[in-house]
Amino acid sequence: TVIQGYALLKLPQAEATQPLPRDVVKVTFTSGTTGSPKGVLLTHQQISAVTESLIEVAQITSDDKHVCVMPLAVLLENIAGVYVLLQAGAQVLIPSADALGMQGSGMDTPQRLLSMIIQKGITTVILAPGMLEGFINVIEAGHPAPTDLRFCALGGASVSISLLNRAAALQLPVYQGYGMSECASVVCLNAVNSNHIGSVGKALPHVRITLADDGEVLIQGGGFTGYCQNFGVGRWI
């Protein structure tokens, strides 16, 4: 067929795409550590279960003030930072990368973020281990430590016990945890009144963890919907 001199190609009819379950509100992709990245389906129920548990464990109140350091595309910051604090009626600050002292994906000038935390009275923050090390180096070099900061969650990568011990020596309120995309981020977290260095803490209140006969760790809680094109894969992860 020719319309005003342009030929229209007849394309094969595409197959209908399977719609997502109606209660899915977010699709987040895994990092692909053990295979190709998969689109994880997260429901309102699953996200709410995590945020309510984190509010309880981290003792978040409307008096808290959180600063987003990680990109909002990072599920940990998205859920444990923004959603948790807003659900509790607290404040969330989203500064520019320059204001945070970020250069690319790394923290070029940690003293800039540290100064902001002090000046703005920030009470909660989420850091990767490399960011925490930058903080510690600056404070050990003589920069004042933040006095209002009461909960610094650590995630995104494994962390050495020596780094946690350095943080403890400076009386920094650092709490290590563990999570995965399929569980809407956080699964375990050290609590304010129960912080054990070298441990990822206890399972969140809505989570159940057990071991299979072969030693595999099985996690249940919040309702796992599945992946894109693979719904209803089971109750355990």
Enumerate the predicted regions with their spans.
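Structural core segment of the AMP-binding/adenylate-forming
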Residues: 1-18, 118
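Short beta-strand->loop structural element characteristic of the AMP-binding/adenylate-forming
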Residues: 1-4, 38-41, 90-98, 103-104, ...
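Conserved pre-ATP/AMP-binding loop-to-beta segment of ANL
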Residues: 12-29, 36, 59-65
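Conserved AMP-binding A3 loop
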Residues: 25-50
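Alpha-helix/helix-capping structural signal
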Residues: 45, 130-133, 157-158, 162, ...
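Conserved AMP-binding/adenylation subdomain of ANL enzymes
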Residues: 48-65, 72-124, 129-133, 137-138
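Conserved ATP/PPi-binding loop(s) of AMP-dependent carboxylate-activating enzymes
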Residues: 199, 203, 212-237
